[in-house]
């Protein structure tokens, strides 16, 4: 499981209210949520984003309200993964449950800048900043989490009888 994309970098404490503002929670349709992804933080986010790009954040990414809409929104917008120094635990678990890969790697975040090109190998836990020609080691996902992501979420795994 590998992805590559350009970095869109943000800071610490990116909460679920700026990932998907509460005023748009009248729907659970991923494509509708995606239209408003990060708009309260960066009004040009969707203009900057190319499918497959990687969001890089600081500490406590996904803090705030416990809403599954936040990782659904980011995934539906076309972001391939999020790399952060740390994640709010409920955001982390919600992301895995919907099959959206996220990694914690403080060194990679410290060195990355918006526009850098990254390659991410989730099986090995390797993040390569192609722009800087640097490689970082994150904690790879255990097999059961890889299974969830490969099958686009926990619900699909259960439907297929994998768990």
Swiss-Prot record:
It is an enzyme of class 4 (lyase). Heterodimer of LeuC and LeuD. GO terms for molecular function: 3-isopropylmalate dehydratase activity. Belongs to the LeuD family. LeuD type 2 subfamily. It comes from Clostridium acetobutylicum (strain ATCC 824 / DSM 792 / JCM 1419 / IAM 19013 / LMG 5710 / NBRC 13948 / NRRL B-527 / VKM B-1787 / 2291 / W). Keywords: Amino-acid biosynthesis, Branched-chain amino acid biosynthesis, Leucine biosynthesis, Lyase. SUPFAM superfamilies: LeuD/IlvD-like. This is 3-isopropylmalate dehydratase small subunit. Gene3D superfamilies: Aconitase, domain 4. It catalyses: (2R,3S)-3-isopropylmalate = (2S)-2-isopropylmalate. Transmembrane segments: none annotated. CDD domains: IPMI_Swivel. One of its GO terms (biological process) is L-leucine biosynthetic process. Its EC number is 4.2.1.33.
